[in-house]
Every structure is written in C-alpha cells, then in structure tokens.
C-alpha cells in the first residue's frame, strides 16, 4: 500500500471519507499489533505510517470541529 496521508490530501476529503479511512487504518493498526505480538510482522515501518495517519486524521477532525464551533459562537454574538 503506497498511500499518502498528507494534510492537503486529507483536507480535500469529505468527513465521511475521512471516517471510513480512519476505520480502515484502525483495523490495520490492530492487525499490525497482533502480527507484532506473534512475531510475524514483516513491514514494521508501516506501523509508524499508520499511527501518524490516524493522528493526522484525528487532528483535522478536531480542527474542523473547532472551526465550526467558533463560527456558531461568533454568529450568536
């Protein structure tokens, strides 16, 4: 899997696409944990890529939620 998880690429995706991608990455992360625990891990660098991609997606989701909250509170004032 030669996926790129650059912030600019992730910002272009919809919220539903990000949630689906996050779910897939979480599943992959679990599979990597099990394979590492059993000693069958082949691609150890992928663990780092997946972990960082999950963090990027969560960060973007949090930022968009904060922006939406700031807009509604500014509109109320």
From Swiss-Prot:
Protein known as: Large ribosomal subunit protein uL29
Cross-referenced PANTHER family: 60S RIBOSOMAL PROTEIN L35/50S RIBOSOMAL PROTEIN L29, LARGE RIBOSOMAL SUBUNIT PROTEIN UL29C
Protein family per UniProt: Belongs to the universal ribosomal protein uL29 family.
UniProt organism field: Gluconobacter oxydans (strain 621H)
Pfam families in the cross-refs: Ribosomal_L29
Cross-referenced Gene3D superfamilies: 1.10.287.310
Keywords associated with the record: Ribonucleoprotein, Ribosomal protein
GO molecular function terms attached to this record: structural constituent of ribosome
Domain of life of the source: Bacteria
